[in-house]
């Protein structure tokens, strides 16, 4: 056992999950299509339609005489440097930043190109857009084995000689070889990002809502794509009506049957088949179909009538083109965007919606219990990389809007348009620095960044492995504070503070590993080889879900699960990929997302 533990920690430190998450976020090493690069390529300012992101982010200027577009991509992080008062620069070390009350950070550069009336101008490469604080011991840190010895790469985990050389070099730079890193240095102070629990996205949870002495069955899902969350709620009312609420589209409830018609299922039999569960639920499905068909409030029997009803509810009094565009936006971008945002994905959304409704009806018939919200399969841990990703997404969009404004001013004053003369690097830097220095994060959260506890070595390690819950401390939340069986081997049962934080502030167990994002496409290619296909009839086999998205079906789900697990044991599929088979509902769930404690 001792050998196993030693080999585990020889490969990874006690704060490896924080460093690995940060490395996955930044463009460093072999991680060229990083999360930050994806954010830059997904920037859309001044346009609502779809644009091919292979050419990078898109900024369209609001000028009358020309069609001017800015494309941006290829974000890079330089080495951490210090700029002196005389303008000179030199590589920095964490110890120098501590002693001089400076921030340990690197310059951020992006390639820009101005396109006038479809004619591209010469690229402006390596334009500095700001600075990014660097995590100590990350791949971009000057103390990393890839950088500390100059051009020579050290391999301290596999070579004893390199390990000794690395430790000697660390001592020369004033660093403790036993310090694991995993924190930032902001204005000379060491600050750590606290991991937070979050509900798993793209996962359906059913619960009973008891409000005003009324019991209603509710299903909820947080559909997430490219960092944007679109909550959706399906509720069975006391009169038996099944209603959908799309939070981003207002409070207007939509009958499930009407919404399924709008998504392209005209046939009553198809709607019935998509929802049908136990025989006790049949009467509710038929009643809902009849209500939408016959009730004067709805009177919707086909897709065209369903679209007209939605137009009256969500774009009343507007021009026809606007009404149609608003409904298309509702169905494609605001309704379950993780399943796709194209018109061709609507049938799949209708099938997924039917599955959600079936779960609500099964719970209403008491054949199923509500989901356990405290089960750790329903949670994800947001690490340093995820928190930096959220912050960088907001900061880069703010930078793009400011650049658009400055370019429009220059154009209106008949000046030459150059990115370097219009871009203000302090917009990005100040936004990121303020959040890390104060702990006030995007989304209204506070206390995300904290001063690292250096009371003892163990106190520092404990602080960097802390996991907090976003729940309000002043409320009881008895079940959330209790130990749960799924905490076994993942969270420490003893280390939690006394007082109002008890049970809401936890610490990771010693040998946990937290999953990083694994490419869905690699898993989908494996599924194609295992005879998973996209059908015309989604009820013709076992549905295969990849990160909540219905990818296809398979005729024999048990065989697929067996072959998938066999491929995972052989190393063809990464060990972090999980698979679960729900034989009762004929669903196979595969997860490759980040934040799962393994």
Where are these regions (language model features)?
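Conserved helicase core region in the C-terminal RecA-like lobe
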Residues: 491-498, 505
């Amino acid at each position: 056992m001792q050998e196993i533990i030693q080999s585990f920690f020889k490969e990874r430190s006690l704060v490896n999950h924080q460093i690995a998450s940060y490395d996955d976020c930044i463009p460093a090493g072999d991680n060229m299509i990083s999360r930050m690069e994806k954010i830059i390529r997904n920037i859309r300012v001044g346009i609502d339609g779809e644009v091919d992101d292979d050419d990078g982010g898109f900024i369209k200027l609001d000028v009358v005489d020309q069609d001017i577009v800015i494309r941006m991509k290829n974000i890079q992080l330089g080495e951490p440097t210090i700029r002196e008062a005389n303008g000179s620069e030199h590589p920095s070390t964490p110890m120098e930043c501590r002693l001089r009350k400076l921030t340990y950070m690197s310059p951020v550069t992006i390639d820009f190109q101005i396109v006038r009336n479809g004619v591209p101008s010469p690229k402006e490469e390596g334009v500095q857009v700001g600075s990014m604080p660097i995590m100590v011991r990350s791949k971009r840190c000057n103390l990393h084995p890839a950088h500390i010895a100059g051009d020579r790469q050290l391999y301290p985990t596999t070579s004893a000689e390199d390990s000794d050389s690395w430790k000697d070099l660390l001592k020369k730079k004033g660093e403790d070889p036993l310090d694991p890193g995993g924190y930032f240095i902001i204005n000379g102070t060491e600050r750590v990002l606290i991991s937070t629990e979050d509900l798993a996205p793209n996962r359906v949870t059913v619960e009973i809502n008891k409000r005003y002495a009324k019991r209603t069955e509710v299903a909820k899902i947080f559909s997430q794509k490219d960092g944007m969350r679109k909550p959706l709620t399906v509720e069975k009312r006391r009169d038996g009506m099944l209603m959908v609420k799309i939070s981003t589209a207002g409070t207007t409830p939509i009958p499930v049957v009407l919404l399924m018609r709008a998504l392209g299922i005209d046939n009553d039999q198809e709607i019935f088949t998509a929802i049908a569960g136990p025989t006790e639920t049949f009467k509710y499905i038929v009643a809902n179909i009849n209500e939408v068909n016959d009730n004067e409030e709805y009177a919707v029997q086909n897709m065209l009538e369903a679209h007209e009803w939605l137009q009256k509810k969500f774009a009343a009094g507007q021009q026809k083109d606007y009404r149609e565009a608003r409904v298309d936006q509702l169905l494609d971008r605001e309704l379950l965007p993780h399943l796709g945002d194209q018109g061709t994905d609507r049938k799949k959304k209708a099938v997924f919606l039917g599955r959600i409704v079936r779960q609500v009806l099964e719970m209403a018939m008491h054949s199923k219990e509500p989901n356990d919200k405290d089960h750790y399969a329903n949670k994800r841990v947001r690490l340093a990389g995820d928190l930096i990703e959220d912050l960088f997404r907001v900061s880069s969009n703010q930078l793009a809007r400011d650049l658009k404004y400055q370019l429009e001013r220059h154009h209106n004053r008949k000046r030459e348009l150059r990115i370097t003369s219009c871009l203000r690097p302090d917009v990005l830097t100040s936004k990121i620095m303020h959040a890390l220095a104060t702990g006030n994060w995007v989304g209204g959260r506070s206390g995300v960044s904290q001063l690292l506890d250096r009371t003892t070595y163990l106190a520092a390690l404990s602080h960097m492995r802390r996991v907090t819950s976003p729940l309000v401390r002043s409320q009881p939340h008895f079940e959330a504070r209790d130990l749960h069986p799924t905490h076994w081997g993942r969270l420490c049962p003893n280390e939690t503070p006394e007082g109002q934080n008890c049970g809401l502030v936890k610490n990771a167990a010693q040998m946990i590993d937290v999953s990083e994002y694994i490419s869905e496409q690699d898993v989908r290619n494996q599924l194609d080889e295992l005879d998973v296909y996209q059908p015309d009839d989604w009820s013709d086999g076992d549905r295969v879900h990849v990160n909540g998205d219905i990818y296809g079906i398979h005729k024999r789900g048990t065989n697929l699960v067996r072959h998938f697990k066999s491929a995972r044991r052989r190393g063809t599929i990464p060990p972090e990929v999980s698979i679960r088979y729900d034989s009762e509902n004929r669903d196979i769930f595969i997860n490759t997302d980040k934040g799962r404690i393994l």
